[in-house]
């Protein structure tokens, strides 16, 4: 697998992918070249998770197992993930994305800020939270299934058993994009009775449903889905009082699926950072509703993307 440097690319100081030769942004040539570049981006993001965010790459296996690391999938964790009082779990969607990414297309065509999970990770670390970054699409290597990670759901369940369930966290937060919502719901079927799981923020994920395991919880589980359709004041996004087992819906600040995690970040963290109870739920949700990053053009088309901040590297 080639590196970005070998392919003649680099991320500039604003996180924009440029060519080494003429310092111009990426331009599509062939699908084969694009896929090769995408794999190089995977490696670059992995490196940034370690060098910029201070995360540690961790082989994924069940406790007590002695499998060789090179035969396993892997995740990224913060140094304090076992001991932190608050633990943030990040789960990407389906397809080619890997740990640390929301959307490969945004990383290549826009910048690191909008396409990676780095802004979420850095904000969590600033708060003193522990961080676990799943890698649910890394299921095989050289056409061989990776043990404990043969499917996205098995990967997520193994991460939960190995890293999250035994942690000392008092509150566990999950942010999941797209298919990551299904993976989250699948995990909750087995672990949803854990009252430490307190808030789940989904970004444009239609696949989440409350499992029966959550019915006997002593502590409320707040779930919000930031959707990439409609607009801020659409009737469907009217804030209502808290109801147990309900998935609240808010506008993500965009009508483009892959932009939802980036545009909703301030609203997501307002929910995660605020002490939420059934009594103040509606107030917190109203505040979060107004924090989505909106495009200058409120009538976005598929080709119109919101403006994003830049991330320095």
From Swiss-Prot:
Pfam families: Arb2
Residue spans of biased composition, Basic and acidic residues class: 296-307
GO cellular component terms attached to this protein's record: nucleus
Annotated region (Disordered), positions in chain: 293-313
InterPro entries reported for this sequence: AB_hydrolase_fold (IPR029058), Arb2 (IPR048263), Arb2_dom (IPR053858)
Gene3D superfamilies tied to this protein: alpha/beta hydrolase
Gene Ontology biological process terms, A to Z: regulatory ncRNA-mediated heterochromatin formation
Superkingdom of source: Eukaryota
Family indicated by similarity: Belongs to the FAM172 family.
Protein name (database record): FAM172 family protein homolog Y75B8A.31
């Amino acid at each position: 697998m080639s590196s970005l440097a070998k392919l003649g690319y680099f991320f500039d100081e604003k996180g924009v992918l440029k060519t080494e030769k003429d310092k111009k942004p990426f331009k599509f040539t062939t699908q084969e070249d694009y896929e090769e570049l995408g794999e190089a981006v995977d490696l670059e993001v992995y490196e940034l998770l370690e060098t910029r965010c201070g995360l540690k790459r961790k082989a994924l296996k069940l406790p007590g197992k002695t499998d060789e690391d090179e035969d396993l999938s892997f995740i990224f964790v913060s140094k304090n993930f076992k001991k932190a009082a608050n633990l943030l779990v990040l789960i990407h969607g389906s397809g080619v994305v890997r740990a640390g990414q929301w959307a490969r297309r945004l990383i290549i065509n826009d910048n690191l800020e909008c396409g990676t999970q780095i802004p979420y990770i850095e904000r969590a670390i600033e708060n003193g939270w522990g961080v676990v970054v799943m890698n649910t699409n890394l299921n095989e290597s050289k056409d061989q299934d990776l043990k404990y990670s043969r499917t996205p759901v098995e990967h997520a369940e193994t991460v939960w058993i190995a890293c999250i369930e035994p942690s000392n966290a008092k509150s566990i937060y999950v942010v999941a994009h797209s298919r990551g919502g299904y993976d989250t719901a699948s995990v909750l079927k087995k672990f949803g009775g854990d009252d430490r799981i307190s808030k789940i923020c989904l970004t444009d994920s239609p696949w989440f449903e409350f499992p029966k395991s959550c019915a006997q919880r002593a502590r409320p589980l707040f779930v919000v889905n930031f959707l990439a359709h409609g607009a801020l004041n659409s009737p469907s996004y009217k804030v209502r009082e808290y109801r147990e087992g309900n998935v609240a819906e808010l506008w993500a600040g965009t009508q483009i699926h892959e932009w939802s995690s980036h545009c909703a970040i301030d609203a997501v963290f307002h929910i995660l950072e605020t002490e939420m109870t059934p009594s103040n739920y509606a107030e917190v949700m109203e505040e979060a509703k107004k924090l989505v990053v909106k495009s200058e053009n409120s009538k976005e088309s598929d080709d119109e993307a919101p403006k994003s901040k830049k991330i320095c590297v």
